[in-house]
Amino acid sequence: MITLYNTLTRQKETFEPIEPGKVKMYVCGPTVYNYIHIGNARPAINYDVVRRYFEYQGYEVIYVSNFTDVDDKLIKRSKELDESVETITDRYIKAFYEDVGALNVKKATSNPRVMNHM
């Protein structure tokens, strides 16, 4: 049994997934305009721990974490480097995978790019 603190009700509650045996998690990922920093690594690590705990408890986990590939910071970076947004996002997504991989963070089940879903 997994018990979680519900900040809305301010009570501990027994976790019951919507679909028995399966947990679906969505976590907002980084804006990929530069290399990650500790603020980007922290949620990747934290939610990796949550995911692994659910898996340890026997749940199938569907973990989705997006890449924000449209943003004012990204447009500014594109102009600074005189490179396309796609070139920049491809570079920093690759670097993100390398960096979180070095931290032993498991890859998400899916990493959609925001631009593909607007």
Curated annotation (Swiss-Prot):
Motif 'HIGH' region: where in chain: 30-40
Keyword annotations from UniProtKB, A to Z: Aminoacyl-tRNA synthetase, ATP-binding, Cytoplasm, Ligase, Metal-binding, Nucleotide-binding, Protein biosynthesis, Zinc
The protein's required cofactors: Zn(2+)
Statement: the UniProt record of this protein carries the keyword Protein biosynthesis: yes
Ligand binding (Zn(2+)): C28
Protein family: Belongs to the class-I aminoacyl-tRNA synthetase family.
Protein's UniProt name: Cysteine--tRNA ligase
Species: Staphylococcus xylosus
Gene giving rise to this polypeptide: cysS
